[in-house]
């Protein structure tokens, strides 16, 4: 059905149809006069009477004029799904933007607006998702189909952890990953692509980018584009998929821009009145079903470090685990710089992960907490003034700190040390051994940047 543009206000375009009214979220293709430009897609956001609709553009609207012809597609934006999307970069409308070959015409396409799985379809059992990263598996374990918040400032290693997770999922669980770059820097997207290529994980991941420079419609809907690709692998292939969203804050931010452009009355701090329901709609689609699961890791930018800001606060309600990266730990040279006392997980309970794992995790945390409490005394009076039992706690805590570091596969290029995937049972055995005092006579440097405890013993032998 044809219509015509009647008004353009930045990324908001009003379109008039003759005797036809497109549905909300329907995609409208604009016929551009300049054939060299990519196609422009509008998405219906509101009905404004008299067969007119207000739409949000998924790309820049430069060169758009009144009276320009539009075609209603009869359905929402549809993006390619399946094996064809792996190793490629897509924009919000599902077109490849990596200068590679076109997506085959017979590739299946799914609508980006989908319902969340029903209660009957959802899986009720809680299972741990093993990542092979010691600090995560021991202290803040991820659950299959769970949502993890990744908190950290610039340059503390968020991207490296994301890439390591993609690597481990591909090689240990032979699963696929989907990465949605929501409103982040173009340079970071480019770097990530090349780093993945160098680390040999690219052919197991689909990338969807809606960068900072793009209009709010593209930045908002790109999260749905990526999620749709992940849902296909879960529902049709029965796989456990990893879904990365970097950055979930930008999803809320772009929604707020769209809301203002559409003239809705803002709510707290200028955010859209529908913030909680928009976030809920996205997050409810990320879950485990009887067929497979989508486990998501979402980087969360906290504006001005204010955790009560409505955008991060709306994310917290949905998270099952948090992985907090700490600059002080990174400064000590301990990578991954995960804060063992700040990171939390809903499934860190004896009923789900078992008594042994639970006791070891809590034991490690209590030793680290005691060490933290003693640091003021050490700074003022020095180690010699501590009691013998406190000296032992400090020695074990320092070993635990070093043992929480681990060489990554994707960082082999920079560090020169081969990456390690540590099975959960080895992680638990190693830390329990430190707590029990089995390794009190081994120097702490032997625990630094190794995999399992057997490597510590081998390293200690070499150091003699």
UniProtKB/Swiss-Prot annotation:
**Which sites bind ATP?**
152-159
Q: What are its E.C. numbers?
A: 7.1.2.2
Q: How does it sit in the membrane?
A: Peripheral membrane protein
List the transmembrane segments: none
Give UniProt keywords alphabetically. ATP synthesis, ATP-binding, Cell inner membrane, Cell membrane, CF(1), Hydrogen ion transport, Ion transport, Membrane, Nucleotide-binding, Translocase, Transport
Q: Which InterPro entries match?
A: AAA+_ATPase, ATP-synt_VA_C, ATP_synth_F1_bsu, ATPase_a/bsu_AS, ATPase_alpha/beta_chains, ATPase_F1/V1/A1_a/bsu_N, ATPase_F1/V1/A1_a/bsu_N_sf, ATPase_F1/V1/A1_a/bsu_nucl-bd
Catalyzed chemical reaction(s): ATP + H2O + 4 H(+)(in) = ADP + phosphate + 5 H(+)(out)
What does the UniProt entry say about where the protein is found?
Cell inner membrane
Q: Which SMART domains match?
A: AAA (SM00382)
GO MF annotation list = ATP binding; ATP hydrolysis activity; proton-transporting ATP synthase activity, rotational mechanism
Q: Which Pfam families match?
A: ATP-synt_ab, ATP-synt_ab_N, ATP-synt_VA_C
The similarity comment for this entry is: Belongs to the ATPase alpha/beta chains family.
Q: Please explain the role this protein plays, according to its UniProt record.
A: Produces ATP from ADP in the presence of a proton gradient across the membrane. The catalytic sites are hosted primarily by the beta subunits.
Self-association state and partner proteins as the record states: F-type ATPases have 2 components, CF(1) - the catalytic core - and CF(0) - the membrane proton channel. CF(1) has five subunits: alpha(3), beta(3), gamma(1), delta(1), epsilon(1). CF(0) has three main subunits: a(1), b(2) and c(9-12). The alpha and beta chains form an alternating ring which encloses part of the gamma chain. CF(1) is attached to CF(0) by a central stalk formed by the gamma and epsilon chains, while a peripheral stalk is formed by the delta and b chains.
Q: What is this protein called?
A: ATP synthase subunit beta
């Amino acid at each position: 059905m044809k219509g015509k543009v009647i008004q353009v206000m930045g990324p908001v375009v009003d379109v008039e149809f003759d005797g036809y009214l497109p549905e909300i979220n329907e995609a409208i293709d604009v016929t551009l006069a300049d054939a060299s430009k990519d196609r422009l897609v509008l998405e219906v956001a509101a009905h404004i009477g008299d067969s007119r609709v207000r739409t949000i553009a998924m790309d820049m609207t430069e060169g758009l004029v009144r009276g320009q012809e539009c075609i209603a597609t009869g359905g929402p934006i549809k993006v390619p799904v399946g094996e064809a999307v792996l190793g490629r970069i897509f924009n919000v409308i599902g077109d490849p933007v990596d200068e590679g070959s076109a997506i085959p015409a017979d590739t299946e396409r799914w609508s980006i607006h989908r319902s969340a799985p029903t209660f009957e379809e959802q899986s009720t059992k809680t299972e741990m998702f093993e990542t092979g990263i010691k600090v995560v598996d021991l202290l803040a374990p991820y659950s299959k189909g769970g949502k993890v918040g990744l908190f950290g400032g610039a340059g503390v290693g968020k991207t490296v952890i994301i890439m390591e997770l993609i690597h481990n999922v591909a090689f240990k669980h032979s699963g696929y990953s989907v990465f949605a770059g929501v409103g982040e820097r173009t340079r970071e997207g480019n770097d990530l692509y090349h780093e993945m290529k160098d680390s040999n994980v690219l052919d197991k991941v689909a990338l969807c980018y809606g960068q900072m420079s793009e209009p709010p419609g593209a930045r908002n809907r790109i999260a749905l584009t990526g999620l749709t690709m992940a849902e296909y692998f879960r529902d049709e292939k029965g796989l456990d998929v990893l879904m990365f969203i970097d950055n979930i804050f930008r999803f809320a931010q772009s929604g707020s821009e769209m809301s203002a452009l559409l003239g809705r009355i803002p709510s707290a701090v200028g955010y859209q009145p529908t913030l909680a329901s928009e976030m809920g709609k996205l997050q409810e689609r990320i879950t485990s079903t009887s067929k497979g699961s989508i486990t998501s890791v979402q980087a969360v930018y906290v504006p001005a470090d204010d955790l009560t800001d409505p955008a991060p606060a709306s994310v917290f309600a949905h998270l099952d685990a948090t992985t907090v990266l700490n600059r002080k730990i990174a400064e000590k040279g301990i990578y991954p710089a995960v804060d063992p006392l700040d990171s939390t997980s809903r499934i860190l309970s004896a009923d789900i992960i078992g008594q042994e794992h639970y006791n070891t995790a809590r034991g490690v945390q209590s030793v680290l907490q005691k060490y933290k409490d003693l640091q003021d005394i050490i700074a003022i009076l020095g180690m010699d003034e501590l009691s013998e039992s406190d000296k032992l706690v400090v020695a074990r805590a320092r070993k635990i700190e070093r043992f929480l570091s681990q060489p990554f596969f994707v960082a082999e290029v920079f560090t020169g040390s081969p990456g390690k995937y540590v099975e959960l049972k080895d992680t638990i055995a190693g830390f329990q051994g430190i707590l029990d005092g089995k390794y009190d006579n081994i120097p702490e440097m032997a625990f630094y940047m190794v995999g399992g405890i057997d490597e510590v013993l081998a390293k200690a032998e070499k150091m003699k």
